[in-house]
Curated annotation (Swiss-Prot):
This is tRNA-2-methylthio-N(6)-dimethylallyladenosine synthase. It is found in: Cytoplasm. Its main location: cytoplasm. SMART domains: Elp3. Binds 2 [4Fe-4S] clusters. One cluster is coordinated with 3 cysteines and an exchangeable S-adenosyl-L-methionine. Monomer.
Amino acid sequence: MTQDSALLQAPEAIPSESLRDGSNSRKVFIKTYGCQMNVYDSMRMSDALARDGYEPTEDMEVADLVLLNTCHIREKAAEKVYSALGRLREMKKKKAADGREMMIGVAGCVAQAEGEEILRRAPAVDVVIGPQTYHRLPEALRRAKQGQRVVDTEYAIEDKFEHLPIAESRRIRARGVTAFLTVQEGCDKFCTFCVVPYTRGSEVSRSVSQIVEEAEKLADSGVREITLLGQNVNAWHGAGSQGEAWSLGDLLYRLAEIPGLARLRYTTSHPRDMDDRLINAHRDLSALMPYLHLPVQSGSDRILKAMNRRHTAAEYLALIERIRTVRPDIALSGDFITGFPGETDEDFKDTLRLVEEVRYAQAFSFKYSTRPGTPGAELKDQVPEEIKAERLERLQMLLLKQQQEFAESCVGKEIDLLLEKPGRMPEQLIGRSPWLQSVNVDAKASQIGDIIKVRITGTGTNSLFAEHAEAAV
């Protein structure tokens, strides 16, 4: 899952007027790094901490607990966390001198990868907790209050979601009309460049009943759009009411029946797990938005094999054709890596050719960075940094051109726009198009959550502009 996805958003603090006892509650500041799943995890940790009297704050200075929810995907991720912990150590010392206590916790994938090393290198840290054990965070903090320094990164036998509360309606409403919902975690693909199997573990799917219960609570609390999350979300599997095997497509058909829930999305997918049921869901479900993030990483079969992607460029292109046949208006997004070990100029040209053929609405691209413990780090023929950078620049120029062309192709179209949040100008709201673009339109704050018909009138640097086409629906 890309850490720079357009879906990325920070958890929002609940306004003080919505707190039951805002004057006496303890405050938690959560800094979220990385992917959408970390955003979701931060929200679930915040909800769990609420039962122990913690309420979120956006002001680190008033926080009784500072929690870093970390990501281990990019190069030097751990060192960036240690740098942040050094700054927090000084803040903790300053608060202690003023007679105020501040606890520091590290969660997420760096916590999983580093474990005890964090306590050794950052003595100010009180709690280290992994992504599979954060349901035990309140207990870890209670132990830390008693003077223990806690590391809890062992993969839990129990299902953490069975022990996590679903947020109260007031907290859901404060977060807006769109929401993330994790349905699957971990990955069994073992791509040679990726740390996810080592930090998130093997593939685990949440039960249908858990997912439906949470989705219904979100919809009842005013959420209009849900994005299903997973490191390999289309590997999700479960059982229907009669015990029959369900895939992600079956789950989407079920969620589309929930009253009030107008839109569905999912991310991130692996090409090998795009089955017929899921493809047909794009054909049949009006609630399933015509947008698909389907990473390919390279257009070279030789590099795809070295990456252990388990598909060829031709198979990926054939899959794209099948999807576009059933949903011609679908917009595609992807992930790319330049400079994987052994990548030649011809391999890179294969990637450019694939991009030209697919034509992406948006995409995310990165230079290859070695991740300790992955097979890719041991490969010979590491590509020089300057060549990685030059290839990345060329690729990004092509992807940006395609993104701009897609945005311009939307001008003049009438679309359904979900109004999400205030814009920069008075009497302006920002909405989300079916293709995940931000759209600016004149509207009142009372219309947030409405889906209105608009006509796209122009493009900006990272957004579109629109005018009303007809009344709200």
